[in-house]
Every structure is written in C-alpha cells, then in structure tokens.
C-alpha cells in the first residue's frame, strides 16, 4: 500500500482569536473521524492555525482504501431451489444482483442451516476522490455559533473564505470546500513577503509559508516564540513578564509573524492600584505587564506586533500613545472615587435592582451582611476564630464598589477596587480582603479564600444568590445558567471542603432563605437548593477522578456537612482499594436485599444465647469487639480507619453466609440473625452504603 502526506488549508479573513484554537482542534478531530470511518489509515495528524487560515496536515495517509472481501449472504438453500433442484426466482434475483450465477455461489453452513453466499471483492476507492467530501463534512461540524454569508452565494462560515488548497503529496485534489474551488494558491502576510504563491507539495507548507509568505502557521511555535521573547525582554529591564496562558493564546491567535517589543508609561500612573492598570493593559490592549522581582508593577509593558518594522521605535511610540489615555482615565477615576467612602455609597445601591423579585443591591448587601455574620458566629462556636463584626461589615460593603467610577469603567476590577477603597477608608484588613475575595473561586482552578472572615463573606455572597434564584423558580435548565449558579455551588463546596469548615448546608440554606423573607415563591426552596448542591458534589468529585460508585455510596447517606462528605469520599476511595472491599461490598448488597424483604420492624439487638452456629457466633463476637473501637472513630469522623477496621470482618462475613441459613424456620433464630446482619450493615452505614460499590 502506498502512502502520502495530505495538506488542507482554508484561507479566510481574520478569524476570531478566542475561537481559533477551538476551531482548529475541532477541524482536526472531525476530519480524523472521517478518515477512520473511511478505513483510510494514517500515521499522524496535526493542525496549524493563524489569523487568516486553518490547516490540517495528515502524514502517512494511504492513497487508497484497501481492497476487501465482503460476504454477501443470500437465501437459505432450502428456499433457493425447488423440489427438482432448480434455482428459485429468489435465488436467481439475488445472484443477478451480485453479478454472478446461482451455480457460482458458495455454501455457508451454520447451526441454523445452509445458505448461499458470495465472497465479493470490493476494490478500495482512491483517497483523492474522497477528501473533499470528508473535509466538507468536518467543516460543517465546527462549533460556529454565528456563521456568516458573503458574496452572492449561500455558503456560510465563521468568516469569508478566499482560498482552498488540498494537496496529496504533490497532487492537487480537485473539488470545492465552502464554495471555493481547490487550487495551489496560498496567501502570505498582508504586508510582508509574497502576497500569494503556489504550493508545489504538501510537505513544503510550513517552510514555503515562512520563507515566501512571512507567516508562521504553526500556532504552538508562535506561542513559544512570544513567550520566550517576552520573558527575555522583561529580564532585560530587570523584570518578570506577566504571561497568563489565556492572554498568550489570544495574542498568538492575533499575529502571523510575532515581533516582541518593550514600551513604557509614566511612573505617576503607578499611584493607581496595579490591578486597574493591569486590567487596562491586558484586557483592552493585549499587553503583557511587567513586575519587579518583589511583585511590584513596573512602568513598562511588553506587546507583540505583526510586522517586522525597520523603525520599531515608531511602533513602540504608537502603542505608548494608545495606552496613555486609558491609564489617565484609570488615574482620574481612582482620584475621583477616593473622595467618597464605600459606606457613603450604600444609599446609591438602593437605585440599582439586583433582580426584580429579590430587590435592590442594597437589600442584597444587607442580606449578605447578616448571613456572613451568622456564618462567622458558627465558625466561632466551633473554635475557629472569626470576627462576626468584620464579616458583617465586609458583607455590607461588599457591593459598594459597584457604584465607583473605576468599577463602572473596568468591570473586572470589582471586589479588588473595593479592597483598595476599604483600606483608604480605614476599614480593618480582614474587611478589605474579604471584599476582594467574596467572588472567589472565580473559575475552575482558582484558589479559595482561607481567612475565616473572607470565607464567611464569600459563602454568604454565593448562598444569597443560589437560594434567591431557586426561591423565585429560576433554577438552571439544561446548559442555560444565566446567574452562574453551578459555579456558585461548586464555590460553596470548595470553600467549605478545602478549609475543612464545620458548616452544615441545611443550616446555611435555612438562614439564607429566612433572610429573603417573603420574596421567595418556591415552597420547596431549601430542598431544591440542597439537592442542587448534592448534584454538584457528584460532578465535582467526578472531575477530580473519583469513581462514580464511590460518590453514590456516600450520597446514599446524604451527609450535609461538606467537610464530612469529603472525609467519607476519601475513606470509601481508600476502602475500595483494599483486598476485602469487593467481598464486603457484595455481602452488604446481599444483606441489604435480605433486610429489604423483612416486613415490620427489624429486631434491634442480638441475643447471644440464640446464636447456635459457629460462624454466626464468630461474626457476632468479632463485631462486638470492634464496636467500642469504631464508636470514637465515627464520632471524630475518622472514617478511613473505621472502614479499615471493618475490612477485618471479611472472613467472618464470608463464613457466615457459607454456613448459616438466615431465614431459618425457627422465628427466634431468624430474627436474631436478622438483628446481627442489621447491626453489621449499620456499622458500614455510619460511613456510606458500600453495597453500591461495583
């Protein structure tokens, strides 16, 4: 079989930078699936992407499908011939349809009878005749929320398409993609290199684009160049570049020929909180801020241009002129905002509606304040130092910065600017930090607050939203989650679990519901919110790699203290790895089935004198000896050690089921054995329902 390398390039107008990688990944995955479905083997597949192109490179692709033999079964021999041995019309029709005579058919004998068969040789189709249709299907499946039309045709794509190139080795593959006929024309950089050139071979794509077109089509290479050059540029001025992955990917998606340059701004702007300046540089301008070794912002930034200029200073000056007004705005907003305290802005929160049925932002801040104070008191009652006064104060001021000029202009600085203004107002440091950390965790992988006051406020902020929105009947449906309730729920669980806070969801939900008063119309609010949080437990632990049966085993016990829930999950995960776990899980399932069939109340206590079999005596004695050791472990939540002790029962349990008839004819013996099994199961149920383990 012969193999060649395939190139497919779609030349477009500028693609959305935040979608570029997703589009390329999806294009590759879809096309690879097409190759597999078509029985076309290949060695490797990769994608290339730049602002004006999506490309695939398939190496070691078979130039044709392999020939294969397909068995085509005909009618049964019993119905293929009449009594005189002549072919029936059914047999003749089948043979004719397969291009043979009945006499040329072979026989297949199975346990169900004898059949006519034809071993048909199917010649493999040439790859070059399949590529265009497969590529079009792959493109049709791309995740494009808002496709657009261009020109006079009805073709739709994320951006207008100007060129299509499909090469199998040096062979040009004919056909159309997205209404554009395939040819060898590749467009280069808009301002450097050749505007367009002809590509002679699939293998020369990257090198020809680089040398003739001044385009680096390799996305990962552009990322690596930008990162390395930005780090070197920052080091040259004694700093460290702030290169976050999402911004790096966006910048790499904006340029075809990355050139890294360093610029500066006036030091006076450093009097403005660094977060506001960084937000302006990164969010608006796509610049990389530079910090010194101690983490202090420097009056410099690094940016990436898409052209190799003979006069880079002109480009630097241009970017400095662009960013200066934005920094000046931030300075003006900061100086203006400082004239009014956060507390003085509380009355203005009355003018902003949080949600029509849930009241204004001022009402929301007051609820958060009371709930945060309640949570802090709960933590204090459990010997965790937490100032309920600070928590209540931070909750009250938590939304005040939304009324500042800075946050109105730079929305992502909410919370952070509240912290800075709180410090300027003379609020305690705990209050200031809690105002900033109320929104944490903001995204998957983000850190959670650790200070007790911050935890109280962050929990209150999320619980108020969660309970309120559920209370007015607007729970998330399907993928829609306009109030980000799933993120809020995961945040609540993470804060409690990662800080091992002794808080009960039932108490927190009840308090939050009470604070909403008559605003809520859903009569099942508390139950619905608790169920929602329990469901988040499952998805969160699955994302962490915990087996589903482990999660279900714990969920069956409905523990409502997240820290306790986590301890149980970890204990059951550990137990699942023990040699005895499989047998004990099966035994628990058997016990559960037996007890489920018992009518009436189960007997509570085991009567030693009614234990007649050696195996049941051994199990009862071992269980009795373990219970004094288990009780303190259950009380302190040391579930892992408890299950480790219970694993010692394996042999006794196995022997019991081997030797003892539970449902004995003697009612007293039967009830005593049921009591023993019930006692056994209750010990495991102190942790989880391990009968659910697979």
UniProtKB/Swiss-Prot annotation:
Catalytically driven reaction(s): tRNA(Gly) + glycine + ATP = glycyl-tRNA(Gly) + AMP + diphosphate
GO terms under cellular component: cytosol
Localization of this protein: Cytoplasm
UniProt GO molecular function: arginine-tRNA ligase activity; ATP binding; glycine-tRNA ligase activity
GO biological process: arginyl-tRNA aminoacylation; glycyl-tRNA aminoacylation
Keywords: Aminoacyl-tRNA synthetase, ATP-binding, Cytoplasm, Ligase, Nucleotide-binding, Protein biosynthesis
Listed EC numbers: 6.1.1.14
Any Pfam family the entry gives: DALR_1
TM helices/strands, residue ranges: none
Keyword Transcription: no
PROSITE patterns given in the database record: AA_TRNA_LIGASE_II_GLYAB
Main localization of the protein described in the UniProt heading: cytoplasm
InterPro entries given in the database record: DALR_anticod-bd (IPR008909), Gly-tRNA-synth_bsu (IPR015944), Gly-tRNA-synth_heterodimer (IPR006194)
Coiled coil segments of this chain: none
Oligomer status and interactors: Tetramer of two alpha and two beta subunits.
PANTHER family: GLYCINE--TRNA LIGASE, CHLOROPLASTIC_MITOCHONDRIAL 2, GLYCYL-TRNA SYNTHETASE
Listed HAMAP family: Gly_tRNA_synth_beta (MF_00255)
The family this protein is said to belong to: Belongs to the class-II aminoacyl-tRNA synthetase family.
Protein name (database record): Glycine--tRNA ligase beta subunit
Source species: Shewanella denitrificans (strain OS217 / ATCC BAA-1090 / DSM 15013)
Record gene name: glyS
């Amino acid at each position: 079989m012969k193999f060649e390398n395939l190139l497919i390039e779609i030349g477009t107008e500028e693609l959305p930078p935040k979608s570029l990688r997703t589009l390329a990944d999806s294009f590759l995955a879809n096309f690879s699936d097409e190759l597999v479905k078509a029985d076309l083997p290949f060695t490797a597949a990769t994608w290339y992407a730049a602002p004006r192109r999506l490309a695939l490179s398939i190496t070691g692709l078979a130039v044709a499908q392999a020939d294969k033999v397909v068995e085509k079964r005909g009618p049964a021999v019993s119905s293929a011939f009449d009594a005189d041995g002549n072919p029936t019309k059914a047999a003749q029709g089948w043979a004719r349809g397969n291009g043979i005579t009945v006499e040329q058919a072979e026989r297949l004998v199975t346990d169900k009878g004898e059949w006519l068969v034809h071993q048909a040789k199917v010649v493999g189709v040439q790859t070059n005749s399949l590529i265009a249709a497969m590529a079009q299907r792959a493109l049709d499946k791309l995740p494009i929320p808002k496709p657009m039309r261009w020109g006079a045709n009805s073709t739709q794509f994320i951006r207008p398409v100007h060129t299509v190139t499909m090469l199998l080795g040096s062979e040009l593959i004919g056909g159309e993609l997205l209404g554009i006929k395939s040819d060898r024309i590749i467009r280069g950089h808009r301002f450097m290199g050749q505007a367009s050139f002809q590509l002679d071979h699939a293998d020369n794509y990257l090198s020809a684009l680089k040398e003739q077109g001044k385009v680096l089509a390799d996305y990962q290479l552009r990322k690596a160049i930008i990162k390395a050059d930005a780090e070197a540029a920052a080091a040259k001025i004694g700093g460290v570049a702030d290169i976050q992955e999402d911004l790096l990917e966006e910048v790499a998606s904006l340029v075809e020929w990355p050139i890294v340059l360093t610029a500066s701004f006036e030091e006076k702007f450093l009097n403005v909180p660094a977060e506001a300046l960084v937000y302006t540089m990164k969010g608006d301008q796509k610049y990389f801020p530079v910090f010194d070794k101690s983490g202090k912002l420097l009056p410099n930034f690094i940016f990436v241009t898409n052209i190799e200029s003979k006069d880079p200073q002109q480009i630097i000056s241009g970017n400095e002129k662009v960013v200066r007004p934005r920094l000046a705005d931030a300075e003006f907003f900061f100086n203006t905002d400082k004239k009014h305290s956060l507390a003085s802005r509380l009355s203005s929160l009355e003018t902003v509606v949080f949600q029509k049925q849930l009241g204004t932002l001022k009402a929301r801040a007051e609820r958060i304040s009371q709930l945060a104070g309640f949570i802090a008191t709960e933590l204090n009652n459990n010997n965790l130092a937490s100032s309920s006064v600070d928590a209540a104060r931070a909750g009250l001021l938590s939304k005040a910065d939304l009324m500042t000029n800075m946050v109105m202009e730079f929305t992502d600085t909410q919370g952070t600017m509240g912290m800075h203004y709180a410090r300027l107002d003379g609020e305690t440091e705990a209050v200031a930090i809690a105002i900033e950390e109320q929104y944490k965790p903001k995204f998957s992988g983000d850190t959670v607050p650790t200070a007790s006051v911050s935890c109280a406020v962050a929990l209150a902020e999320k619980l108020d939203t969660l309970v309120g929105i559920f209370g007015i009947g607007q729970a998330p449906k399907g993928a829609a989650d306009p109030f980000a309730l799933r993120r809020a729920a995961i945040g609540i669980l993470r804060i409690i679990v990662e800080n091992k806070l002794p808080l009960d969801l039932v108490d927190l939900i009840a308090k939050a519901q009470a604070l909403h008063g008559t605003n809520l119309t859903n009569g099942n609010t508390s139950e619905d919110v608790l169920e929602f949080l329990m469901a988040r437990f499952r998805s969160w632990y699955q994302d962490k790699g915990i087996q589903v049966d482990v999660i279900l085993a714990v969920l069956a016990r409905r523990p409502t203290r997240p820290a306790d829930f986590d301890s149980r999950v970890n204990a059951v995960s550990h137990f699942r790895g023990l040699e005895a776990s499989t047998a004990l899980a099966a035994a628990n399932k058997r016990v559960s089935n037996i007890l489920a069939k018992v009518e009436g109340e189960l007997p509570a206590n085991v009567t030693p004198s009614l234990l007649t079999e050696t195996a049941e005596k051994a199990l009862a004695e071992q269980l009795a000896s373990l219970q004094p050791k288990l009780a303190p472990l259950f009380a302190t939540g040391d579930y892992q050690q408890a299950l480790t002790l219970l694993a010692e029962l394996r042999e006794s349990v196995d022997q019991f089921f081997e030797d003892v008839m539970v449902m004995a004819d003697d009612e007293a013996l039967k009830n005593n054995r049921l009591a023993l099994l019930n006692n056994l199961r209750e010990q495991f149920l102190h942790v989880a329902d391990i009968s659910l383990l697979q």
